[in-house]
Amino acid sequence: MGIDISHKHDRVARRTAPKSENPYLRLLSKLYAFLARRTGEKFNAIVLKRLRMSRRNRQPLSLAKVARVVKQAGNEKKTVVTLSTVTDDARLYEVPKISLAALHVTEGARARILAAGGEIITLDQLALRSPKGENTVFLQGPRSAREAEKHFGPAPGVPHSHTKPHVRSKGRKFERARGRRASRAYKN
């Protein structure tokens, strides 16, 4: 007698709608679901996937990174598309002329982009302007830049691990001896 195949792990984990209750985000999701289906373009499928992502996976993007990409040859006339917040960067001295499509732009970044003669458009305006994603460049923030990420990896204390330990205090007595100083057995 045969054994039935266990289907308990067959679930495909993917979001079919944003977790957020924000009606504008939900409308954008519907719009790009339509575009992805009808155009068959990879661009629209990526926008749709990122619209449904958690905030933790849509990390903020610095204005400096946007400026760096725009300054590259061939990108001057392209629209920068990002599904995260674009934040101002005080270290950036001069902002080039930028065409940006983003979910959210901070006040400081918005003022600097507009002052430089750039433009900021919404994602529904982008859908009208380039329904197939033509003349666009995709950007996203660094996902592994969170403080919590520093604690992930091989256990702190094993050779060649640079993982940050979870400690009560940063004092002399807390995970600062064996393996951290050559005078105490060894140093990684």
Curated annotation (Swiss-Prot):
Origin superkingdom: Eukaryota
Main location: cytoplasm
SUPFAM superfamilies in UniProt: Ribosomal proteins L15p and L18e
Subcellular location: Cytoplasm
Region (Disordered): 143-188
Residue spans of biased composition, Basic residues class: 161-171, 178-188
A Pfam family this chain is assigned to: Ribosomal_L18
Keywords, in A-Z order: Cytoplasm, Ribonucleoprotein, Ribosomal protein
Gene Ontology MF annotations: RNA binding; structural constituent of ribosome
PANTHER family hit by this protein: 60S RIBOSOMAL PROTEIN L18 (PTHR10934), LARGE RIBOSOMAL SUBUNIT PROTEIN EL18 (PTHR10934:SF2)
Family: Belongs to the eukaryotic ribosomal protein eL18 family.
Name of the protein this chain belongs to: Large ribosomal subunit protein eL18
Lineage: Eukaryota, Metazoa, Ecdysozoa, Nematoda, Chromadorea
